[in-house]
A protein has these predicted regions:
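N-terminal Sec signal peptide and the immediately downstream disordered periplasmic leader
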Residues: 1-89, 251-252, 311, 627-629, ...
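Acidic, small-polar-rich N-terminal luminal/periplasmic segments of exported/outer-membrane proteins
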Residues: 41-178, 542
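C-terminal beta-signal and adjacent terminal beta-strands/loops
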Residues: 563, 670-678, 699-751
Length: 751
């Protein structure tokens, strides 16, 4: 048996085992309990409500693989941004190479790595029903989150903007009718501080409720800049506010108005991880490259400035059992970055640069604005030909306009040269979508969904240069523009079967679609002026969702196989010896695997959670672009940023104390196997397997409305990389916040 056949056999066997386990749990669930009902209720796992199907429904009932993370749990764990949230979701990973502009979320090993404004993300981010069109917008601080849902696999039939790999659905807390508020503070080693406060209540009882939340966070960083006058880098400062007003003018109408504003300044750096050149080692001194190096020698520290803001209005109207929804939104994202493309210095540092290792300084601005409108109707259960049918359908429109300026200054020992590019993209996306469920029998349901999409895209690009020929990292002057329009479709077919009162299984086929793209970036060339073809996917998934022992145990399993065609990927090339990237239709890739989400409540005091994912994402047929400088022998290789196995384990033990107090002891462990960060499979870009242990001890009073906790992060003091970037003669590392052990204290008071 070949290695490939062994893998497929293992996957199919595991999927079958999972379905058998679900059936066994369904049988176990019908066994009468032998304990009093009151104890059963106290020990049961709380029901989780999600909106993954655009209706409020139990997580256990929706025929979609969904991971759910509770907002309060994230706050207590100091996971306050998307890059740390994915630590609790094994099927998801996060990649950030520079600033927020260069960030990507991956689901099941699939994501789009590109800074181009002319490409849409593979994983769509939706916040309170509003799609964020650019990936960089999603790197927000989590101000007042009720929960985060990660929908795995193509989701275009129900979400207004198609997502060929998945959806990150973020839901904020609704205002309470009762007046109240809270304040919480956190402090962690490294002088990381976070303060939040909020108030909410009724402005007009029964009609108007409102809430306002504000937050401030500050962290110097965990990398030392040893340059004269330098300080800590790799930190951040964030401040923002979010206001929400819910209006209920009558029993059939709800209106939600939301405004948010967030300003974030950060100083992300990459440290020298490895060097293979004596010249580079000499230029780097006194910094020494190494796997745990947390020092840089930069004369100008990097700075990323982001301002995210938006307004949205959602109107829900119910009539004759139908629910009509309108979501109108406008958002702005301004991004400015001052970064270095070299580990040994920037444009002002000429003493250490050489012709082999020039210093580069990048200055870029992004001005992005989007307007969106979604109209949706959810039907009641109606009779069609003797079958009960319900459906959700809608129309969607998104207009996005981007304007960017990017300048690169390259310094050698003898010269200073530069290039500047002014470019932008305008896109209009139209869609009609819907999905329905047909009851074939009492325990059998059919799922049918479809979506039509039209994308209209145009770009402009103009670059100037101080040289007539290419020099390190800068192409000669050029100017171009173009436009394209494409229609596409996606859909979903499936069956769902109830195995018993507390278990069901489903099987679905989904077609995903991601629109055309333009590779618009600083070093754009005439060969990049043609539009990239849309990316399509065909996904097959089987799953089981079950609970047993009076909801003391829930087990959700999914097995999937997805094939992508015209995969839009970043291709690494060289310009006068400097590594640059450009987007291409890379050909065919695929991903397959098994996922498990398990929750257990063996006693009222113990809560156990496990999330596991085996994901095999690989390149099937790589299309090498013409005149490529790099080798393209990649068929059969693994896709970057996709470890084969990830696990997240969490345990909490609650101890009731006198006087209404409670002590909670919790610990979590996330583990992943080795990860390849380079599409071209460089052995220098592999992060070995590692695990991170976190723990906390908390004392709280439900009557007093307060809690205080001691939190420990990365207790085993395990250094690791979230990205490794291979350059000529050296490798750089992206250093995560929890690269070393640290502890902190948090406190919260509600009133």
């Amino acid at each position: 048996m070949t290695h490939q056949n062994k893998k497929n056999t293992w996957i199919h066997a595991a999927a079958g085992t999972g379905l058998l386990l679900g059936t066994a749990l369904a049988i176990a669930a019908d066994v009468p309990p032998d304990e009093p009902a009151s104890e059963t209720i106290a020990a049961s796992i709380p029901s989780v409500t999600v909106t993954a199907t655009r209706r409020s429904a139990s997580l256990q009932s929706v025929p979609i693989a969904v991971s759910v993370v509770d907002g309060e749990q994230l706050e207590r764990s100091n996971r306050t941004a998307i890059d740390t949230v994915v630590q609790e979701i094994p099927s998801a990973t996060f990649r950030q190479q520079g600033g927020n502009k260069d960030s990507t979320i991956f689901v099941r090993g699939i994501g789009t790595i590109s800074t181009s404004p002319g490409v849409e993300p593979t994983v769509s981010t939706v916040v309170d029903g509003v799609v964020y069109a650019r990936p960089g917008q999603a790197t927000l601080d989590l101000l007042d989150i009720e929960r985060i849902e990660v929908l795995r696999g193509p989701q275009g039939t129900l979400f207004g903007k198609n997502a060929s790999s998945g959806v990150l659905n973020i839901v904020s807390r609704a205002p309470s009718a009762q007046p109240g508020g809270f304040a919480d503070v956190s402090w962690y080693q490294g002088d990381e501080k976070r303060v939040r406060a909020g108030v909410n209540g009724s402005l007009k009882p029964g009609v108007v409720r409102a809430s306002v939340v504000a937050a401030y966070a500050d962290y110097d960083g965990n990398v030392d800049n040893i340059h004269a006058g330098g300080s800590k880098v790799n930190g951040y400062e964030r401040k923002g506010t979010r206001a929400r007003v819910d209006i209920t003018p009558n029993a059939d109408t709800d209106i939600s108005l939301i405004a948010d504003w967030l300003k974030a300044d950060s100083s992300p750096v990459q440290t020298a991880y490895q060097q293979s050149s004596a010249g580079f080692a000499q230029a780097l001194l006194p910094v020494v490259a190494g796997p745990e190096n947390r020092r840089v020698n930069a004369d100008i520290a990097p700075v990323i400035e982001d301002v995210n803001k938006g307004l949205s209005a959602q109107i829900n109207w119910r009539h004759n059992g139908y629910a009509y929804t309108s979501i109108t939104a406008v958002r702005d994202w301004d991004n400015t970055q001052y970064t270095s493309g070299n580990a040994i210095g920037n444009s002002a540092e000429v003493a250490r640069v050489t012709s082999a290792y020039p210093a580069s300084r990048d200055i870029g601005t992004v001005d992005f604005r989007q307007v969106s409108q979604e109209l949706r109707v959810a039907s009641p259960r109606i009779d069609v030909g003797g079958h009960a049918v319900d459906y959700v359908s809608g129309l969607y429109y998104l207009h996005g306009k981007d304007a960017e300026v990017y300048r690169r200054i390259v310094t050698t020992a003898t010269s200073v040269n530069s290039g500047r590019a002014d470019y932008g993209v305008t896109n209009d996306s139209y869609a009609a979508f819907g999905e329905g469920t047909v009851a074939l029998a009492q325990d059998w349901r059919a799922i049918l969904g479809a979506r039509w999409t039209r994308d209209e895209l145009d770009y402009r690009h103009a670059r100037t240069s101080t040289q007539a020929t290419a020099f390190a990292g800068v192409q000669p002057a050029t100017q171009s523009s173009g436009e394209t329009a494409r229609n596409g479709w996606s859909g979903r077919l499936g069956l769902q079967h109830d195995l018993g009162a507390t278990a069901n299984t489903y099987a679905t086929y989904s077609r995903g679609y991601k629109g055309p793209a333009y590779n618009v970036f600083f070093n754009m060339l005439p060969r990049d002026t043609n539009a990239l073809d849309p990316e399509t996917s065909n996904s097959f998934e089987v799953g089981v969702k079950s609970s047993a022992f009076n909801r003391r145990l829930t087990v959700n399993l999914a097995a999937f196989h997805t094939e992508y065609d015209n995969y839009q990927a970043n291709f690494y090339d060289t310009v006068a010896g400097a590594v640059v990237t450009r987007l291409i239709n890379a050909g065919k890739v695929s991903t397959r695997g098994i996922e498990a989400d398990i929750a257990a409540r063996p006693t009222p005091q113990w809560t156990l959670n496990a999330a596991l994912a085996y994901v095999d994402a690989r390149i099937d047929d790589f299309k090498c672009p013409a005149a490529a400088a790099a080798s393209c022998s990649l068929n059969g290789k693994t896709l970057p940023f996709s470890p084969k196995f990830k696990a997240y384990l969490r345990a909490n033990y609650a101890v009731p104390l006198p006087n209404g107090l409670q002590a909670d002891f919790n610990a979590d462990y996330n583990y992943q196997t080795k990860t390849q960060f380079d599409l071209f499979q460089s052995p220098l870009a592999v992060q070995g397997a590692y695990g991170i242990v976190n723990a906390a001890v908390e004392l709280s009073s439900s009557e007093g409305g307060w809690r205080v906790a001691l939190v420990g992060k990365n207790l085993a003091d395990r250094s690791y990389a979230t990205n490794l970037i291979v350059n000529s003669g050296y490798v750089n590392r992206t250093v995560p916040r929890d690269d070393r052990r640290y502890v902190g204290i948090t406190a919260r008071k509600e009133f």
